[in-house]
Curated annotation (Swiss-Prot):
Stretch list, region Disordered: 845-867
Protein source organism: Blotched snakehead virus
Subcellular localization: Virion
Lineage: Viruses, Riboviria, Orthornavirae, Birnaviridae, Blosnavirus
Record keyword Acetylation present: no
Residue ranges of domain RdRp catalytic in the record: 387-591
GO biological process terms, semicolon-separated: viral genome replication
Keywords for this protein: Covalent protein-RNA linkage, GTP-binding, Nucleotide-binding, Nucleotidyltransferase, Phosphoprotein, RNA-directed RNA polymerase, Transferase, Viral RNA replication, Virion
Name of the molecule in the record: RNA-directed RNA polymerase
Subunit composition and interactions: Interacts with VP3 in the cytoplasm.
Cellular component aspect of the GO annotation: virion component
Function summary: RNA-dependent RNA polymerase which is found both free and covalently attached to the genomic RNA. May also contain guanylyl and methyl transferase activities.
Originating gene: VP1
Gene3D superfamilies reported in the protein's UniProt record: 6.10.140.300, Infectious bursal virus vp1 polymerase domain (3.90.1730.10)
MF annotations from Gene Ontology: GTP binding; RNA-directed RNA polymerase activity
Length: 867
């Protein structure tokens, strides 16, 4: 370290800031923390994992097998996509699980950093700590304030670590999820709360309004196989968004989605055809044995890999807290996303563009988003307001702000909550303009009866252990939707109970009443007063103080709302409220880099330097500009990195063209007016925060008849929104369709009649009256048709269909390493004594297992779904 830090002035400044005494002569010895050596993971193999789970009474499952992956000709699987094969977009062969032998899968997660294995991974930002030290010792203003920020930053480095935790931390998280689902407030289905699918959908209209898929551009109906959503002749791709670099999951462990696109499509197509056959044979909710047998064959569609989430963890909780990602099987992700993504991607409806909406879906705190929230509170300081985003609920009442989180939100879900999501998407999203459904019976069965059990109360793979998942698997395609539904139900019951104050016992009693656990994360009393104080004390200098590209003279006061992790501060220069990342989160992000997020750039010359530039500029954007010491340090390091890149002759623009993909804040920067120059100035921050043009809402015109959740809950309580419980069959009847068509014809006929040229007021009123009556007739019939659809789907809202798997209590059997080996299907299909037997006897040549014979038949079927 430079001698500048060992001068008497520097040593005195640093020791005072850190509150240190009796330090050594060399500043570096005590200023720069040594790389952390994490404790040894107590769980080293599957036997120890099984014993840990058994001690905590966690349900382990008997191992199930998957047919070996076999290469098949892509052109034969998808004749209509031969053009993709010819162009090289698709490979000539496709792997599908259709071999004559089966194996029991295994997945061993990677945890970094590890005990006694030094690695650069997860190291703190040494350059930023050194730069902050230099800036602190050479600063002239506010040494006490900057000393506090410096100490907080170094404490963050000492107390936290970026990494993927431990096996014991993952298992501890599983056990904690089970305790939430089955413990003091066991999960309750909507039916146990007296809520029908239609009632939940009516509430979701207020908390998460949606429109038709694709918005004004339209979208193909849910009536085909997934491969038919690709049209090479027209260059159209209607598949949901796919992150190609992410894990493919079962049955392709170790591969990415980009490597297995055709494989996943082949599985989805085959599965859809099989479901279609079951539907044709009459497999409904009352008789679902055929579907159940089908799901037994495709059991792996409901088994996610238990992936450790790389995050900034507290070192003291390294062995007890590792967040899990339920890495869904790629085919499952495709099926669920095909139902939800086209709708949600075009339904960014929230508090900013839909009156009286309480949703924060698609909300961005920039572009005037934070200002809209704060000014709304200040405009009606004595009103009660609330907002919802997934498992986050915000309540403002009695001049106090409450930030509430569902406790381990995913653990509170039941399959019926996922079913409510399906019902809502089908009845409010997948409908035609005339009210008829834009889906067929096969997709309705997938959505209502199968999809819920694929991701809720399903299973996961950890090492070679197959385990029950309590609640929904975190990270599945519907995680947000299911969590948002849970929060909507909780807020609805809070309104029904008379809106008790969150501090009250009546409010906390909602946990037991709903089976939804929650905790109050933050509470700000006298919020209007706190906001006024922040305005009065707002800084007069710096980026958004006076409009100069300089750090402020002192830290701008913030009001820590914890609104999706953001605080609010007031800009005198812009005369508006702007977002800054919660200081604790900002320091954590600054202390521990996550590394280059854009995997496509890895290995390119200058990419790592470009990442440092993007990271520092992004930290400035999200709030670093508000803290003088942090801002000066980030700006200095960015300038040095730019010079470094310039000296190497590497143009920055070529590396940062898609710079937002290089940062952990990419979701926030999406659709913001940011140029590719990527240099944070006062003008840059002003463009970032100026109120932009709001997206036009995309809301189903047949719905959202009741404005506001409070009125909606009141109407539900009085029975005004209840649907008849009679079942009208899954498809609209021909009679229903004829009524719609007849009404539409009447409307069109009258609308096309020549209009009167008379100046007589009564003649013109006759024209208007005829049009009004025809329009009312059409809308009435369209809504009646929708009611038919609702009633039909209620017929599918009984118990969901799921594969039944026996429990395995023997830790030796469930963890025996032999299950990780590839075995003949006749001995590997979940039979424990065969798994533990000696030797391997392969089946005779050409002999296929029952499951393999089924798979062969499925491949040979070329018929599509038209039921």
């Amino acid at each position: 370290m430079s001698d500048v830090f060992n001068t008497p002035h520097a040593r005195r400044t640093i020791t005072q800031a850190l509150g240190l005494t009796n330090v050594s002569d060399r500043t570096q010895d005590w200023l720069l923390p040594e790389p952390w050596n994490p404790p040894m993971d107590p769980i080293k193999n599957s036997q120890e994992a099984a014993e840990y789970l058994q001690r905590n009474q966690y349900r382990m499952l008997k191992p199930r097998a998957i047919p070996e992956n076999t290469p098949l000709d892509t052109s034969e699987l998808f004749p209509h996509l031969a053009e993709f094969v010819g162009s090289g977009a698709f490979g000539t062969s496709t792997l599908v699980p259709a071999g004559s032998t089966e194996y029991i899968p295994r997945y061993y997660p990677t945890h970094k950093p590890e005990h006694n294995k030094p690695t650069p991974f997860g190291h703190y930002d040494v350059a930023l700590l050194k730069q902050m030290t230099y800036q602190l010792t050479n600063g002239k203003d506010n040494p006490e304030e900057e000393g506090t920020t410096f100490r907080q930053f170094r404490d963050t480095i000492v107390e936290q670590q970026y990494g993927s935790g431990t096996s014991q931390g993952q298992l501890a998280r599983l056990v904690a999820m089970k305790e939430v689902a089955t413990g003091r407030n066991p999960n309750k289905s909507p039916k146990e709360l007296g809520l029908s699918m239609e009632e939940i959908a009516t509430m979701l209209e207020q908390t998460l309004p949606i429109g038709q898929p694709g918005g004004d551009e339209g979208w193909p109906s849910l009536t085909t196989t997934l491969s038919e959503l690709l049209n090479p002749a027209e260059g159209m791709d209607y598949l949901p968004h796919i992150t190609m670099k992410s894990s493919s999951g079962l049955p392709f462990i170790g591969k990415t989605k980009g490597e297995t696109v055709t494989s996943a499509l082949a599985i989805c197509d085959t599965f859809l055809r099989e479901v279609s056959e079951c539907v044709k044979e009459g497999a409904m909710a009352s008789d679902n044995q055929k579907l159940q047998k089908l799901l037994q064959d495709y059991w792996y569609l409901s088994c996610g890999l238990l992936f450790p989430k790389a995050e900034r963890y507290e070192k003291k909780a390294w062995l007890t807290k590792t967040r899990n990602i339920w890495s869904a099987p790629f085919p499952t992700h495709l099926l669920l996303s095909t139902i939800s993504w086209p709708i949600m991607n075009s339904s960014k409806n929230n508090i900013l563009n839909v009156p009286e909406c309480v949703s924060l879906y698609g909300f961005n705190p920039f572009s005037g988003g934070m200002d809209a929230v704060v000014t709304n509170i200040l405009a009606q300081p004595d009103e009660t307001l609330f907002l919802i985003y997934a498992d986050n609920i915000y309540i403002y009442m009695d001049r106090t702000w409450f930030s509430i989180d569902l406790e381990k939100g995913e653990a509170n879900a039941t399959p019926e909550h996922a079913q409510a999501v399906s019902y809502y998407l089908l009845t409010r999203g997948w409908t035609q303009d005339d009210g008829s459904p834009a889906f067929n019976a096969t997709w309705a069965t997938i959505a209502m009866m199968i999809a819920p059990s694929l991701v809720v109360d399903s299973s996961c793979l950890f090492m070679n252990l197959q385990l029950k998942t309590y609640g929904q698997g975190s990270g599945n395609a519907w995680t947000f939707l299911i969590n948002h539904t849970l929060s909507t139900i909780l807020v609805g019951k809070w309104i029904e109970a008379g809106q008790p104050n969150p501090r009250s016992k009546e409010f906390m009693d909602l946990e037991a009443a709903t089976g939804i656990n929650f905790k109050i994360e933050r509470e700000i009393e006298g919020l209007p007063t706190r906001l006024q104080e922040a305005m009065d004390k707002a800084v007069h200098t710096g980026f958004l103080g006076d409009g100069t590209t300089n750090p402020p003279e002192k830290e701008g006061p913030t009001v820590d709302l914890d609104l999706l992790g953001w605080s609010a501060t007031y800009s005198r220069h812009m005369d508006m409220w702007v977002p800054v990342l919660d200081k604790e989160r900002l320091l954590s992000s600054a202390a521990y880099p996550k590394g280059l997020e854009n995997k496509d750039l890895k290995g390119k010359p200058g990419a790592e330097i470009a990442y440092k530039i993007v990271r520092n500029e992004a930290l400035l954007m999200v709030g670093g500009w508000n803290y003088p010491l942090i801002a000066r340090s980030l700006m200095a390091n960015t300038s040095a990195a730019r010079n470094n890149l310039r000296q190497k002759g590497v143009p920055l623009d070529t590396l940062t063209r898609d710079w937002e993909k290089m940062t952990e804040f990419s979701d926030i920067f999406e659709d913001l007016p940011i140029d590719t120059k990527l240099e944070v100035t006062s003008e840059f921050l002003q463009r970032l925060n100026l109120r932009g043009e709001r997206k036009q809402p995309n809301v189903n015109k047949h719905h959202l008849r009741t404005k506001g959740l409070k009125k909606c809950v009141s109407a539900l309580k009085q029975g005004a929104c209840r649907n008849p419980t009679t079942v009208a069959g899954l498809k609209l009847t021909a009679y229903s369709k004829s009524r719609i068509n007849k009404a539409k014809a009447v409307f069109d006929e009258i609308n096309n009649l020549p209009k009167t040229e008379s100046d007589d007021w009564s003649d013109r009123m006759d024209d208007a009256d005829r049009l009004m009556k025809a329009n009312n007739l059409y809308m009435r019939e369209a809504r009646s048709a929708l009611e038919d659809v609702h009633n039909s789907l209620l017929a599918l809202s009984g118990e969901t269909v799921k594969a039944k798997t026996p429990q395995e209590k023997s830790t030796e059997k469930v963890s025996n390493p032999v299950v990780g080996y590839r075995l003949p299907a006749e001995r590997a299909t979940g039979v424990q004594h065969a798994l533990l037997g000696v030797g391997v006897s392969r089946p005779s040549e050409g002999a296929l297992t029952k499951n393999a014979r089924k798979m062969k038949k499925r491949r040979e079927k070329a018929r599509g779904i038209n039921h």
